Amino acid sequence: MRQWTRLIIDVDYHPCDPGNSTWYCERTAFSKSDLCAGKVLSYEDPGGLFGGIRVDSVSEDGLVLSYGTKLYSINMKHPHLPLDKGGRDYTEFELNLFLESAIVVEDTPAFYRQFYTRDQVARLRGSDIRALEASDAPAARFALGRWHYLLMPEEDSCAQAEKLFREAAEAGVADAFSALSMMYVYGDTREDRLDLDEMVRWRDEALARGSELAAYRYARNRIGGDLLAPKEPDVVRDEVEKRLATETDVWPEWYAVLGDAYAALDKPEKAREVYLAGVEHGSLRCYPELAMMAREREDDKEYRSWMEKGMAAGCGWCFILDGDLDEERFQAGDSRFKNLVSRQFQERFEQGLRRGQGLCAYYLGFHSFTGTLGFTIDEEDAFRYLRKGVALGDCYSCSLLADILEDRAETPAAKKEVARLRLKAVRYGKDDDREQLAQDYRDGLLDEYRDEIEEYWLPDDDDVDEDDGRWDAYA
């Protein structure tokens, strides 16, 4: 869990001096133990504009401040939502308020849920990471592993994540079994091989131990059905509705799963109703779902509105907004439009990348390499972004980097690197790279992955050459 310890008030100002345009910040801190209902907050305010701020209420979840007849809440659990919906008129002050908090390692569902998604993990601060590193608790091992695996902050983060997950699993952390199962799906373990049998073994053990992360992932798999699970959206719907009706502390992202199930059952109105409820309860994944439903209705205004709301709430996926803008439309604008769009795109994609969104790395890499959308051509930046996208498991980054390096690959080692990037692209979901993967395999560039390729990536047996057992479709 995370517990808040201090209220911080920052007042930004600059002197009333025509010759001085510098902005300054006055910071005042209040200890949680000193805050109580009715307390008047005294703080440095050179402008004298904000007086009479009182504490309305204090709880472990945050606090509510009053200013005249207006109320302002700071929610520790879901920062983008007010603390309650009791008809209160929450209004933002024109100053910066935030809670300083510290992560508390606990063997509780609430603690583990903080590390289920990239958006949640992206909220971790340096002090949080140091606290996790200093802890020997199995729960901290799992949490630190998720930070490494979902954000890939270091070159060996994948190996570190696996080590931490195995340590946590040995100590009995159910969610660690689920985390390891997901690594086998993408070939991210030390074996460097996609292995669905191992994935299922670890997943089933996680489910048997009561892992909510495993239940969440398995429910999502069963909505559409795949190699990992049967297609049964009606069963998922019933399971999640029961969960929402009977559990008192529900993880908000279950609303997104229920909405997905209704969408798969061709009930878009019900799906939208559930997604809206999810937003109200703190789900971040419901924002892009509502945005895409608006796009399907060709309602661009509502689409943009939901994407912008998602960004404000901290949904990393929403930062790809306008990522599909083509060069022709960009060039049709005037210079002011181009400068504005180019700057906004770069800032937006950088923010998404900091939240672990590999697709943002792809956009940054693509435009840095091609010089499109007003980006300056910079191959060094392009390679840096694309390699980050590869580390984050983005199939488009893998494919583009392979395309770029293929034209420059002269040595056997360089050609093998390109082939491995193609394999990663296919592992991460880019099916249209499978033809080239097959050719790389026939050329002997992927012999060490023979078992995986023949089991998962080649067609039926009648397409295999009897002499060498390889795919003969391109002979």
Predicted regions and their residues:
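TPR/TPR-like (Sel1-like) alpha-helical repeat modules
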Residues: 308-315, 416-431
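Short helix-capping/linker turns of helical repeat alpha-solenoids
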Residues: 135-137, 150-151, 171-174, 187-188, ...
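Surface-exposed, beta-sheet-biased, low-hydrophobicity segments with strongly acidic/polar composition
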Residues: 1-117, 124
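Hydrophobic face of amphipathic alpha-helices that form TPR/SEL1-like repeat modules
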Residues: 143-150, 179-188, 217-226, 256, ...
